[in-house]
């Protein structure tokens, strides 16, 4: 690239120099990302009205087999702390633990420090195995159903410009409760609150909704049925819950035969994680209607005498469900499909899966560098598109 050659006096830096640059200046990449967003705002390219939240996973620099158990960790800690160890227990260690034991380019103090770090991760996560090469990475489920040692990459993207507004790397294996953190980061980077924040169904929970309400941001998060309906994947069984229509005024479900199942009970289901809000379960049925319904055998399984609909969610979730039934919000939410491109570019052109980075902080710094490069290219392209459009318009008027 001509600019690169000019700045570097036509000298290509070594890979070691590039790695050192990334290591020493990593904490500045997000600041530079903020500058690209400010430039877009100052140029009038966007006002950040609609920011879309999404998540993906990035494979860590650690194979699935290169992990160590809690028992093996304790054996090695005892060994390096000088406690008596049965030689047979050392011989029975699995290969990753054996490799650590036999590692020649690492002194005992460094090995012990690594093992202490692994012990901390066991306490912090509750997992039964910890990756040895990247102890902060976690086993996560990929889109193909396979598990891999990875990081959860959360992103926020502006609809108008497709610029990346924020990146947040986490250890959580799912996206459920990630919206507040990535949204807060995006607001800090764009220096304003967007009118809309959209997200997939997996983000629909009390924590996300409370955050959006507190920030007075118009959230756009469909429920599972609305998402399935949008892509035409409702359950083919005509008597499945997907085909029971909820009446918000009556607080009742209308069944395919035209009868209403009314609310009759609410239960609080404690969350497994005490720091997360309890789940609210609402039950609906109509025993008399089901008793005399000619379609009961098609709708209910053989032991059932009547149909019961179970619905999860608070009043805030009901309000979100009702809002997402309105066409104006469906149209606004439909825009998010066009902002899912950056990570496709990351994986195909930037080859982020091949990047050798270890640790959560360093992974986030590297993804921020990728996001910075993406935003700079995107800004250039936006400016070129505007200039070309202006030239075409001038040529048309002159002709």
Cite the ranges covered by each PLM segment:
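Anion-binding and metal-coordination hotspots
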Residues: 6-399
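A detector of single, family-specific signature residues
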Residues: 2
